[in-house]
Amino acid sequence: MRLLLFAFTVTAFAGFAQVQRIEMTFEGVNCVPCVESMATRTMRIRGVESASVDGAKGVLTVQLARQNRVRVEQIRDLIQQDGTKAVRAVVEVTGTVARDETGAWILRIPKQALPLELKSSTTYELGATVNVRGVIEDLKRSPLLRLALR
């Protein structure tokens, strides 16, 4: 189960929505050159403005262009290419509030394969664009990223 804990603000702009920043924690590093090349490999992804790795803390920090098509899964998969385990991610994302087929609140992010489920007692305005920052605690493949607002 993926759990995202987020603070959010509603903004007046629309027109684009995507992940803006990702800090992904990893563990199980068996290949020092793999970790050292992680930032370089990340920079090859179109839409990445900067990438840095703190090997001692096991954190890859990725800053994305304002308008990009980068998905959280892309960064997770890049880290896991060499057997390293992606553990959690702190993300900053902008998206549009919607409802899924069951009526649950979700955050739609264009080009993002997985919607974010908004888990909160808060009532949302359909179609509102929100900025959120939160934590994905479980990065296993799943049909839905879970988003719990504080």
Residue spans for each PLM region:
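Hydrophobic h-region of N-terminal signal peptides that target proteins for export
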Residues: 7-17
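Short N-terminal segments immediately surrounding and downstream of signal-peptide cleavage
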Residues: 18-36, 147
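Short amphipathic alpha-helices in soluble, non-transmembrane regions
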Residues: 38-41, 72-82
